[in-house]
Amino acid sequence: MSAPLADIDPDIAGLLGQELGRQRDTLEMIASENFVPRAVLQAQGSVLTNKYAEGLPGRRYYGGCEYVDVVENIARDRAKALFGADFANVQPHSGAQANAAVLHALMTPGERLLGLDLANGGHLTHGMKLNFSGKLYDVGFYGVDPTTHLIDMDAVRAKALEFRPKVIIAGWSAYPRVLDFAAFASIADEVGAKLWVDMAHFAGLVAAGLHPSPVPHADVVSTTVHKTLGGPRSGLILGKQEYAKSINSAVFPGQQGGPLMHVIAAKAVALKIAGTEEFADRQRRTLSGARILAERLSGADVAAAGVSVVSGGTDVHLVLVDLRNSELDGQAAEDLLHEIGITVNRNAVPNDPRPPMVTSGLRVGTPALATRGFGDAEFSEVADVIATALAGGRGADLAALRDRVTRLARDFPLYEGLEDWALVGR
């Protein structure tokens, strides 16, 4: 029981060490990824992993929950206070589980759901035909303007009036602009629909007061905790008090059994951190870095190589890069940046002609580097590295670019001493 991981399972310990090395030595720019503080790692790796706690605080189906009840209540209270919500459920294991619970609570199978098309930046759980949401519900989609790549609220209203959905989703996985939540709420009211906002990507910006909050406008709001919020991989649901009972029962027993109490403890820690000035500063650097990146990727040298920025810029933590006129497709560009030590993900651009495993775009995000400590100077440097790589393609001096990446990574050490604590138990 007391032997460290390195002694019990050197294979897994070795792989964890290699992954730690990868995270330290490269620049993480996948928009949905971040680095959690050591306090979050400690909470998630705690003895709470041993405890079953089906039900809600004060109404459990197991004994011995006197301490985990307090932990969950702290997490719920912090979520409500941070976002100004009437209620919070912190039990969802993931964002997808949270979204499934929201749909389960607000709709019955066969009813109509209106969301942003996956091909235009929506998410799998917003009605994609191979996802549960697309199989259980009658789904309609709105999209972006083919020229501006912005959501046209007049077009959303027209679609809602025609389709008459039971629920309208406002949220995205790859859309670089702020949504008009008041307009979505007005449309939902006009057609008699419920408004659900999925703020998984921008919740940290909302918490810091740097992005409009959907909470005053939406009936229900879902989010992950691990993107801009910088917490453990998990989800939570917020909303109006009138939906608390149906949401709670949709999570348990509707979608899940026992909650992961060690993860809920880690959520509580992350939510506390999200109320600090240090967190707000990180979010300001996240936004500034994304704008620096968008501006550099709009430069003449990059444009000459057929690379452009979708919608002409960004309001959030990510930049969507259009490679349709470039010699590179999304997969090739992802691989190219991987070679120089920058991790991004290929991503479809609006109405992408290429298949989803190839794509014609990249999604590039700044949260993880802001968490690591990057400011404007460092974001300017990494933006220039990316621009140089994409403009030069396979003809770029990859060794020189890799050296620049290595210097940036070394200037911002990550998880110093973590091997002693996490792998060998010292």
Swiss-Prot record:
Entries under InterPro entries matching the protein: PyrdxlP-dep_Trfase (IPR015424), PyrdxlP-dep_Trfase_major (IPR015421), PyrdxlP-dep_Trfase_small (IPR015422), Ser_HO-MeTrfase (IPR001085), Ser_HO-MeTrfase-like (IPR049943), Ser_HO-MeTrfase_PLP_BS (IPR019798), SHMT-like_dom (IPR039429)
Name of the protein in its database record: Serine hydroxymethyltransferase
Keyword Oxidoreductase on entry: no
PANTHER family in UniProt: SERINE HYDROXYMETHYLTRANSFERASE, SERINE HYDROXYMETHYLTRANSFERASE 1
Gene3D superfamilies: Aspartate Aminotransferase, domain 1 (3.90.1150.10), Type I PLP-dependent aspartate aminotransferase-like (Major domain) (3.40.640.10)
Source organism of this protein record: Mycobacterium avium (strain 104)
Keyword Transferase: yes
Catalytic activity: (6R)-5,10-methylene-5,6,7,8-tetrahydrofolate + glycine + H2O = (6S)-5,6,7,8-tetrahydrofolate + L-serine
Family, per entry: Belongs to the SHMT family.
Name of the top EC class for this enzyme: transferase
Cystine connections: none
Subcellular location per the Swiss-Prot or TrEMBL entry: Cytoplasm
Entry keywords, A to Z: Amino-acid biosynthesis, Cytoplasm, One-carbon metabolism, Pyridoxal phosphate, Transferase
GO cellular component terms listed in the entry, alphabetical order: cytosol
EC number: 2.1.2.1
UniProt-annotated binding residues for (6S)-5,6,7,8-tetrahydrofolate: 118, 122-124
Cofactor(s) the protein requires to work: pyridoxal 5'-phosphate
Pathway connected to this protein: One-carbon metabolism; tetrahydrofolate interconversion; Amino-acid biosynthesis; glycine biosynthesis; glycine from L-serine: step 1/1
